Amino acid sequence: MANVKLFDQTGKEVSTVELNDAIFGIEPNESVVFDVVISQRASLRQGTHAVKNRSAVSGGGRKPWRQKGTGRARQGSIRSPQWRGGGVVFGPTPRSYGYKLPQKVRRLALKSVYSAKVAEDKFVAVESLSFAAPKTAEFAKVLSALSIDTKVLVLVEEGNEFAALSARNLPNVAVATAATASVLDIVNADKLLVTKEAISTIEEVLA
């Protein structure tokens, strides 16, 4: 099993933590990660685009001129697609772009991105992230002590609200619970800052 250094909030190394190789030590499957990222990005699309077809455009109920005898081309409505102000043919309609991949694929993708972060030395383990009250300055001190100055995803245990509130005003810092972090969240971050309890949660969820 792989070992990573465990730090406290002051940046001091206190011990090491053992990681489960079945989750944090596999060969990353880039193809699966790609598929899951595309799926999750598709689910984020709003999908509210809409245009009016000829049945939705107002007006045009009357035939503009008689069928025969005028010398002009026959027309049934001034809201036909060939008219200015007419309906749009085959235009976009509101829809959901989301689709689900099998659970096995999603789990493999999570294991792959966690393993990649550990292999690239972009996985920082911290004993805990506990604050007496939501304080952005206190969270900034923790990041500085751990020499984290890039885009970071902080994974905390369920119920640690003060950590999330303390970090939300900091640029390039995102907070998620260990059980709900997505592949897209992890891929978007340069580094992961994970509490010891969150590591246990990840291993429980993906075991």
From Swiss-Prot:
Gene3D superfamilies: 3.40.1370.10. The keyword NADP does not apply. One of its GO terms (cellular component) is ribonucleoprotein complex. Keywords: Ribonucleoprotein, Ribosomal protein, RNA-binding, rRNA-binding. One of its GO terms (molecular function) is rRNA binding. GO terms for biological process: translation. The keyword DNA-binding does not apply. It comes from the Bacteria. Residues 49-78 are annotated as: Disordered. Disulfide bonds: none annotated. Part of the 50S ribosomal subunit. Belongs to the universal ribosomal protein uL4 family. One of the primary rRNA binding proteins, this protein initially binds near the 5'-end of the 23S rRNA. It is important during the early stages of 50S assembly. It makes multiple contacts with different domains of the 23S rRNA in the assembled 50S subunit and ribosome. Forms part of the polypeptide exit tunnel. This is Large ribosomal subunit protein uL4. It comes from Streptococcus equi subsp. zooepidemicus (strain H70).
